[in-house]
Every structure is written in C-alpha cells, then in structure tokens.
A protein has these predicted regions:
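C-terminal amphipathic/interface module of NAD(P)-dependent oxidoreductases
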Residues: 136-173
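Alpha-helical membrane-targeting segments
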Residues: 38, 47-69, 111-141
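Alpha-helical substrate-binding/gating segment
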Residues: 49-58, 64-99
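Glycine-rich "substrate-gating" loop/helix at the edge of Rossmann-like oxidoreductase active sites
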Residues: 1-3, 30-41, 62-70
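Conserved beta-loop-beta element that borders a ligand/cofactor-binding pocket
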Residues: 12-35
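Residue-level signal for the nucleotide or nucleotide-sugar donor/cofactor binding architecture
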Residues: 5, 67-73, 100, 144, ...
Length: 173
C-alpha cells in the first residue's frame, strides 16, 4: 500500500550514508501516545479522545485487528539508547512490547478517561472518511515487535497500555 511504499522509499533514501562510513539507525514508529508541552494529550491520543469524552467512544472497525502503539517516554528512551550505543545500527521498531487488539486498546482508553467503550465505528464509515488510508492505518492492523531494541537491553518505561494511558490521562488529561 501507499504507506508501506512511502516508508520503504524513505528508509532506502538513507542507505547511501553507509557508503560514507556513517552509522544508520532507522526508527519505525508506532502511533505515539504522549502529552503536549502544556500537559494535555497530544498526537494520536488527542484525536481519539473526543468521542470518548462525549460517551460515544469505541473500537474502529471489527476491533479484532492489532493496534500497535508506543509511549513518548519510550520514543525518547529508544532514541537515547541508539545515540549512546555506536554498536547499534539498522532498523528498529519503536513500539510497545505487547500489541493489544483495537478493542483492548479502546477499552483501556475508556477506562483511563472514565468513559465507556461501546460504540464501534464501522469499517465502511472509516473508508468513506479516510479512503485507502483507513485500511492501511486503522483497519488492517500490524503487530510489530521491538525485538532489536529488547536485544540491545532497552527496558520500556511504559510497556503496558493500561498504565500508559492512565499516566497520560489521570493527571492533566
């Protein structure tokens, strides 16, 4: 699809630096959960919250698809590890070590903001709104594993979706 092709081309565009003897670390990011500078939820989480706050949140599509994610603390932690370890190079998946289903993720989101997760958004509605991107970003789901980060000894600060969402929403979210 478009997204996979774009990522592949983007990553390939960095290959020539290796011929110059420059270490190349490619970070593949899952949707990042974090806060903005003012302490309010930002990024993907900011987009997911409004329906939940209006008591109409729920899974996207069937809810069975995997929903990979990562916490901003782990994005910065992984980047710091790669900067500090000249022996590491190549491609790294920046995602939580366990990927929940979309239903599990939205249940955790509802719980963290004290709202139900009961109203699914049907796939045809998402496709009508987002076209091909609905399938690529939200409906097909991916289940990457941060194996290379873990092998390098990285310890995730937010490995669990429930505690990660609570950390972002209980205090100031």
């Amino acid at each position: 699809g478009f997204l996979a092709d774009t990522c592949r081309q983007w990553e390939q565009s960095t290959v020539p630096v290796e011929a110059l003897g420059i270490r190349r670390c490619v970070m593949r990011f899952a949707p990042v959960l974090g806060k903005k500078a003012d302490g309010t939820p930002g990024g993907f989480l900011e987009r997911m919250l409004p329906p939940f706050r209006m008591f109409v949140g729920g899974p996207l599509g069937s809810g069975k698809q995997p929903f990979c994610w990562t916490h901003l603390e782990d994005v910065t932690g992984a980047a710091a590890l790669l900067l500090q370890r000249p022996d590491l190079a190549g491609t790294f998946n920046i995602c939580a070590p366990r990927t929940p289903s979309m239903s599990e993720f939205t249940r955790a989101l509802g719980k963290a903001c004290g709202r139900p997760s009961w109203l699914p958004v049907p796939a045809p509605i998402l496709r009508l709104m987002l076209g091909q991107m609905a399938d690529e970003l939200l409906l097909a789901g991916q289940n990457p594993v941060p194996a290379r980060l873990q092998a390098a000894g990285y310890a995730f600060s937010q490995p669990d979706v429930d505690s990660a969402l609570r950390s972002l929403l209980i205090h100031g979210g």
